């Protein structure tokens, strides 16, 4: 006969075992519907304890079933329900709590990429939890991890996709780095990749956990990913390493011939993978990025981005989106499915041949945490024999945050300046002066030893940065040909022309010279523009004697005649070519006035000026 204590113990063990079994059944049922060999329309059983609110689950049909190549067959995964994965009590409870609030089916908010509005009674918790990841976690939890999205591709891209033969293409390892990512955004990333990717093109997904401190990203995630129908590897880094080193960890593990880096809060769309893989397979020195659409950080609405934008950068070495210039549009012609050759990529999402990635030096391991690595690899690829493309037929939505939720050792600015300085020192030659003039604080940041990276550049016989500006990015805010760089100083008052932090359409001013660059950093280009980053001094739309000069966005292709000046170094005058008037510094204003011989308010010195 069992004792009372022993009986209770046996009952407890039975209850725990039953709970774990039910959890495994629940998860198995979920992933049964991710198996392409199963029906896509069957309802979940009525007694499904976790998903009983979603009476009918209709996961997105895997892209493998609609492969454009009739001879290509998806890899059939083993029947997941035949496998048993041990789950301890604590992990089982964590998974149950996570999945009770998790939406799987199509009957939830946000379908078709629409946004969601958080109910009034949840506004307080929404605002509190927004700080967790700097996006609306509550809204994300209201949206199915299998949410539907329209086919956003152009007709030309659909036609191109239907004609694309993917049989025999190399397999891809998808690498996703995360740190304290929200559960639902990470899962939505995984589900969308698996639902919308041909299985025969996927070698594996590699998740690199950069020292997260949230419990659900350890054992619960380990257990969850084992049920997916493709190999998913999860590595937990022992120390916070940053995006760059974490990606290197993932790339070293990768078995695929192509590496495809993704962020942890994205949603891929129909036909996203095939164009990227095909372009890299065609030329192993191509690096190809998708169009990056916007997922609202508040409502999670999916908003498509323009097909005619490309990546650039400014004097701060910040990545920027700009309109594709006419010369590139002309090269592409009327074919909307043709990739855009871009000077830089955003860096979060791109595909690259694995061997080429290592041949050209992978990532600069001297960089810290995150920031600037995208410009460094962009310059390196172009200057060392490769090319960069944005493919309009591949679209991936990305949750863009207004600020990072993460902390940086020594502060964000220090890390960003450190990384940018390494890029400037290794790749930008004499043009690094533009960065240091615009960001004087970077002069005080230690860039570290860059000798190995310079040796790499020499070994690869990479081209000069001037070549890059002249041949790849002639529209860059950094002029390939310039006459001066620095302050514009009145020779008698010793005061400087200053942007005063003004923007397009506003007027600069005159301030005491501080010698630190920044707002007082100007360049007289070989074409006669007076630039401060991507803003040019201009006579403005309406000119009259004594009117103030304006700041205007510099022209991308053809020089605007309103922006052209002629400097006489001997007389010190800056003549506005169109009006024939001289730049005049009166009080705190910068104006155009009648030129007068010996007028002290019209005598200027341009720092670093070199005559043509």
Curated annotation (Swiss-Prot):
Keyword Amino-acid biosynthesis: no
Binding-site residues for substrate, renumbered to this chain: 210, 240, 370, 401, 406
SUPFAM superfamilies: Nucleotide-diphospho-sugar transferases, Ricin B-like lectins
Disulfide bond entries: 157-393, 384-462, 496-513, 536-554, 582-595
Region listing for Catalytic subdomain B, in residue ranges: 339-401
Top EC class for this record: transferase
Keyword rRNA processing: no
Domain of life per record: Eukaryota
Cofactor: Mn(2+)
GO molecular function: carbohydrate binding; metal ion binding; polypeptide N-acetylgalactosaminyltransferase activity
Principal location class: Golgi
Membrane topology: Single-pass type II membrane protein
Gene Ontology BP term (one): protein O-linked glycosylation
Keywords: Disulfide bond, Glycoprotein, Glycosyltransferase, Golgi apparatus, Lectin, Manganese, Membrane, Metal-binding, Signal-anchor, Transferase, Transmembrane, Transmembrane helix
Subcellular location: Golgi apparatus membrane
Region listing for Disordered, in residue ranges: 61-86
One matching Pfam family: Ricin_B_lectin
Ranges for domain Ricin B-type lectin: 478-607
Function: Catalyzes the initial reaction in O-linked oligosaccharide biosynthesis, the transfer of an N-acetyl-D-galactosamine residue to a serine or threonine residue on the protein receptor.
Family assignment from sequence similarity: Belongs to the glycosyltransferase 2 family. GalNAc-T subfamily.
Protein name, entry field: Polypeptide N-acetylgalactosaminyltransferase 3
Organism: Caenorhabditis elegans
